[in-house]
């Protein structure tokens, strides 16, 4: 199951982690966000224990969105060692995200 990243836990769970983190910035009112939601859940199950995969609701956690300059959603950031190493804007097939994850493991 995908994690829920928030303003409160993001620093510890993502930025201070040695693992790759995949963060899906989304909102309930966003159609493409809802479309990619099941893909994020599948990847979270597939990479459980190896990669931190989770979601940030931009309406509930606006500080994270501002800090990362998120202006379009869904936006998926790949963070490793406290740095953004890749990103994907818009809904894409699972294979695209899987390839990006593999590239940064």
Predicted feature residues:
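Proteins that catalyze or organize thiol-disulfide redox chemistry
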Residues: 1-52, 60-105
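Conserved residues in the N-terminal Rossmann fold of short-chain dehydrogenase/reductase
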Residues: 55
């Amino acid at each position: 199951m995908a994690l829920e990243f928030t303003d409160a836990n993001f620093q510890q769970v993502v930025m201070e982690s040695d693992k790759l983190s995949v963060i899906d910035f989304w909102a309930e009112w966003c159609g493409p966000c809802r479309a990619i939601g099941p893909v994020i859940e599948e990847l979270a199950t597939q990479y459980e224990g190896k990669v931190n995969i989770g979601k940030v609701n931009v309406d509930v956690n606006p500080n994270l969105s501002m800090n990362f300059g998120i202006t379009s959603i869904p936006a998926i950031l790949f963070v490793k060692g406290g740095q953004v190493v890749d990103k994907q804007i818009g809904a894409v097939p699972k294979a695209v995200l899987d390839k990006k994850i593999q590239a940064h493991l």
